[in-house]
Regions:
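Aromatic-rich carbohydrate-recognition surfaces in CAZymes
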Residues: 1-90, 121-124, 250, 254, ...
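Short glycine/serine- and small hydrophobic-enriched flexible loop segments
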Residues: 56-63, 129-140, 198-201, 239-243, ...
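Alpha-helical solenoid scaffolds that mediate protein-protein interactions
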Residues: 1-4, 8-11, 15, 61, ...
Length: 290
């Protein structure tokens, strides 16, 4: 984990202009790097989620020991820069977002990135987690950003919850009410419904979390037996199932994956995030949060 944190901080973008495209850049963001030579085209999937999930990693490492906390203290300035990248994707009174896809209405929802300013439900659930981490990190002296993370968190939580229309969550907050999901469409419409409970924007055992999880499984319940509905395995579904204590489906999926592992094989497109999400699911089932 320390190696990854060091690598990530060494890759931070430290100027407000993208050297590859000449376009505006968010300081503290990180590009995608490829292969052993770590080449980049100056692009990323998002700024908001990358920063948010990184802050969560930092918090979890700091909680393990005082030694880890002291190690991170030495990197306080750079970690604060990552927090600022997340902050600078969030639509607030002091930050005007591009309005290509949505309104600048100070709702404390994040956009994915400057050149694709969409307020995604999935990203904002991750950002909500990142704001919780940032609040903890600031309280523990590991970042020094001059913002009130409690306000950011409360406002972001309220706006994510407001994307629920009584039946489903909108998968993005587009202009003029766009973003209403088609639940027969796996990505992003259906699978995004699992994210508010998974990232605890709403309680995982709440009526809404159970309702959207049940709806998801009506159309895509065969995930547990190994059916894929996308190019990737999406093991994060198993993690969502674990947070709602669906032991049967999680155990069925784990047996499916073990059927590959026992033969020294892997499921197609089995990347680190897929393995990590499944390990989190197993851990949650074995150590349920009471």
């Amino acid at each position: 984990v320390k190696k990854y944190i060091t690598w990530y901080l060494n890759k931070l973008n430290r100027t407000n202009i993208n050297p590859h495209t000449g376009q505006p850049e968010i300081i503290g963001s990180v590009y995608d790097y490829y292969g052993d030579t770590e080449t980049t085209h100056g692009t990323y999937d998002s700024v908001d989620s990358y920063a948010a999930t990184f802050l969560e990693i930092v918090m979890e490492l700091a909680k393990l020991s005082e030694e880890n906390k002291n190690w991170l203290q030495e990197k306080k300035d750079d970690i604060s820069l990552v927090a600022s990248a997340m902050i600078n994707t969030i639509d607030t009174e002091s930050f005007s977002i591009p309005t290509d896809f949505t309104s600048d209405d100070n709702d404390y929802l994040s956009i994915a990135k400057l050149d694709y300013p969409v307020k995604y439900l999935m990203d904002n659930c991750e950002v909500n987690m990142g704001l919780k981490a940032a609040l903890w990190l600031k309280d523990n002296g590991l970042i020094d950003n001059a913002v009130d993370f409690s306000t950011f968190l409360a406002q972001n939580t309220a706006s994510v919850k407001a994307l629920y229309n009584g039946t489903v969550f909108r998968w993005n907050k587009g202009a003029n009410g766009t973003g209403t999901p088609d639940l027969s469409k796996f990505y992003a419409d259906a699978v995004c419904q699992l994210y508010p409970g998974l990232f605890q924007v709403i309680e995982p055992d709440s009526e809404i979390a159970n309702k959207v999880y049940t709806q998801f499984n009506r159309n895509f319940g065969s995930w547990a037996s190994g059916t894929t509905y996308d190019d990737y395995p999406w093991t994060i579904i198993a993690y969502a199932a674990a947070t709602i204590n669906d032991v049967t489906r999680v155990e069925t999926y784990v047996k499916h994956i073990y059927s590959y592992n026992s033969k020294g094989q892997q499921k197609d497109r089995w990347y680190s995030a897929e393995a990590g999400s499944l390990l989190l699911a197993i851990d949650r089932i074995q150590n349920p949060i009471v």
